[in-house]
Amino acid sequence: MGQPLLLIAAGGTGGHMFPAQALAEAMVRRGWRVKLSTDARGARYAGGFPHVVEIDQVSSGTFARGGALARALVPARIAAGVASAVVGFLRDRPAVVVGFGGYPSIPALSAAVALRLPRMIHEQNGVLGRVNRLFAPRVDAVCCGTWPTDLPEGVEGYYTGNPVRAAVLERAAAPYIAPGDYPMSLVVIGGSQGARILSDVVPEAIARLPREILANLRIAHQAREEDVARVTEAYDRAGLLAEVKTFFTDIPRRLSEAQLVISRSGASSVADISIIGRPAILVPFAAATADHQTANARGFVEAEAAILIPESALDPGSLSEHIAAVLSQPEAARQMARNALAHGRPDATERLVEVVEHLARKET
């Protein structure tokens, strides 16, 4: 019997592609053949996949971008992609098809439904994306990176967690040093593009902290390129020691050394914080589709691992009070860190592998 084939279908964003890559790496190590089905945009994110993974570029499209003519052509492009996927699957039959969301996953998942192949999806956020919501009732397993996840009626989800980078796993459950009268680290993460509202509010909020906290505080603040100068100046005016950059290459190390993290609540950020196990103040991106960042934060907040502040309620005074509450109560901060760890899923990739192998065994 030859090597079983796993067909991974994923859209062209890092959020879809990273967990897809983690699963691909794990399945290749287990002796599977792996193919990635994506569009031209997704192929640009596939550079980190194992070199043995075949990449099939499919015809697809989205109703979210382009003019009226481009949107009118989307159904025909998707239909062509589905037909091509069916032909490809008949020629080289996958043992399992896994969708990670995004319009480019439609052809492969549709072909899997038509041919009754074992199939599953993985959703990174606490609200299903459009494509995953469409296929959730039509697959054999719905794996959830965030818990709880808002699922269609009658659909059961399995909480696998979101796969994270090796650098994060290396620091999983790193010992937490509670706040005290010694140097403390505060990390501010604005997501992949930084966050203007955090740059507007956080420096002033920190400047309002009690003097005994400020004397020990060291800050690492990720900001948009156009905000770096003014954020740096704001910290300098307040006499605060701060590193302000558009991107920190060593975020896992900084998280492991932090007493408190202030962050957006993108799925990968919440996963990183929970696996390392740190208290957090989360400010969901208000314009996120279906308010999924609030959904991402919900379980973390309910576990008493984080404080949630909606953008509409974010101001220097209230944020300063929340920061002070965490940094002045060592035992409470320690408990938040423990709660964060309990919510994390450092074995997310292994859980996904188990579902794939279970579906493959059922088929045989």
Swiss-Prot record:
Q: Which domain of life is it from?
A: Bacteria
The terms describing its cellular component in GO are: plasma membrane
Q: Which Pfam families match?
A: Glyco_tran_28_C, Glyco_transf_28
Broad class of the protein's primary localization: membrane
**Protein name as annotated:** UDP-N-acetylglucosamine--N-acetylmuramyl-(pentapeptide) pyrophosphoryl-undecaprenol N-acetylglucosamine transferase
Query: Which family is annotated?
Result: Belongs to the glycosyltransferase 28 family. MurG subfamily.
| Origin species | Cereibacter sphaeroides (strain ATCC 17025 / ATH 2.4.3)
Q: Does the keyword Transferase apply?
A: yes
Name its cellular compartments. Answer: Cell inner membrane
Enzyme class, top EC level, equals transferase
- Pathway in which this enzyme or protein is active: Cell wall biogenesis; peptidoglycan biosynthesis
Which positions are annotated as binding UDP-N-acetyl-alpha-D-glucosamine?
T13, G14, G15, N125, R165, S192, Q293
Topology within the bilayer:
Peripheral membrane protein
The biological processes this protein is annotated with in GO are: carbohydrate metabolic process; cell division; cell wall organization; lipid glycosylation; peptidoglycan biosynthetic process; regulation of cell shape
Q: Which InterPro entries does this entry report, sorted A to Z? A: GlcNAc_MurG, Glyco_trans_28_C, GlycoTrans_28_N
User: Which UniProt keywords are present, listed alphabetically?
Assistant: Cell cycle, Cell division, Cell inner membrane, Cell membrane, Cell shape, Cell wall biogenesis/degradation, Glycosyltransferase, Membrane, Peptidoglycan synthesis, Transferase
